[in-house]
Design a protein with these regions (language model features):
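Short beta-strand/loop segment that forms part of the nucleotide-sugar
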Residues: 28-36, 58-60
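Active-site-proximal specificity loops/subdomain of glycosyltransferases
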Residues: 43-88, 99
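The conserved acidic donor/metal-binding loop of glycosyltransferases
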Residues: 90-94
Length: 155
């Protein structure tokens, strides 16, 4: 099964390293759309994506809010590349999947190829906001309930 991820980012230097590591462990294809980052996010992404054949970087040189159109364009690219299931995450969103196999099993549990599925998550917050760069070792406040919102998964 080939899993893909689309993420749209802007000025995420504080969390992008952890997010890319997380994405690399779970996804075969990663499509990153950079919405004019000026904090070093774009430079970092270009440097790591150069060594990852399954990753693509897009720079959106426009100040308009066209996330839906961009997402649709990149989604077509992903399915043209043979992705079996496609996730949409922001750079500050991490899937609670103990392994790649567990994530694949979740996808296999979706209703079918003609119907999109969804996943839920918990909105965690760092207990301390220093240092400015996020690490998986940072203590987090984890709420008892999942968010009332869901993330889309397209098979």
């Amino acid at each position: 099964m080939k899993l893909g991820l689309i993420t749209q980012v802007r000025d995420e230097i504080d969390i992008i390293r952890a997010f890319c590591s997380h994405a690399d462990a779970l996804f075969d294809r990663v499509y990153v759309v950079d919405h004019q980052s000026v904090d070093g996010t774009g430079k970092y992404l270009k440097s790591i994506i150069a060594g990852k054949p399954g990753w693509r970087y897009f720079f959106l040189d426009s100040k308009t809010k066209i996330q839906t159109a961009v997402g649709n364009f990149v989604m077509k690219q992903a399915f043209d590349d043979g992705v079996d299931a496609l996730f949409f995450l922001d750079a500050d969103e991490f899937l609670l999947a103990p392994s790649r196999k567990a994530l694949e099993d979740s996808v296999k549990g979706l209703p079918g190829d003609e119907c999109a599925g969804s996943i839920t998550w918990k909105n965690c917050i760092r207990e301390e906001f220093e240092p400015p760069v996020f690490s998986f070792n940072d203590p987090l406040w984890v709420p008892p309930l999942e968010s009332k919102f869901a993330k889309l998964v397209v098979p």
